[in-house]
Amino acid sequence: MSTTFIIAFVCYALGALISIAFGVNYLLRSEFMPYHREAVGVDWQELDPRMRALLTGLMRVAAGGMLAEGISMLIMLQIPFRAGEIWAQYAVPLIGLVGALPTLYATILIRRRTGAHTPVLAGAAGIVLVVAGFILTKI
């Protein structure tokens, strides 16, 4: 692999690891994130048990998406991308952006509507890394 492909590989891997880190965090939490509390203005224990069950389920779904995105990217990087498969140069960023763009949109929307300190920068960083990786494969 050329130097630019190695840097692209690292950018993609870092983007994938951001997604995996958030996915693991959402999967293992027993209550919502501090920025979720900010958004709804209510502590976890004050919520109706059925609402807690619903929110926990939604967090698990989000975790699954983030984990699927990150793990898929890492597998694609390790096998077809490293082997120089042209289609992988498009599949890796596609997987990353399909997962990251809606997530970033949601964090921005929640921040604007509620004032909660959602992780906009982390989401944006993941997207920047994926886009940078794609650009580097085309140089």
Task: Label each residue range with its predicted role.
Residues M1-N25:
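Long, highly hydrophobic alpha-helical transmembrane signal-anchor segments
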Residues L17-R52, T56-L58, I71:
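Hydrophobic transmembrane helix segments
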Residues Y35-H36, E85-P93:
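Membrane-interfacial loop-to-transmembrane alpha-helix junctions, especially the N-terminal start
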Residues G70-Q89:
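Juxtamembrane helix-break-helix junctions at the cytosolic face
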Residues S72, Q89-T107, A124-V130:
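Hydrophobic alpha-helical membrane segments
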Residues P102-L121, K138-I139:
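Membrane-helix boundary connector in multi-pass membrane proteins
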Residues V128-I139:
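Membrane-water interface at the C-terminal end of transmembrane alpha helices
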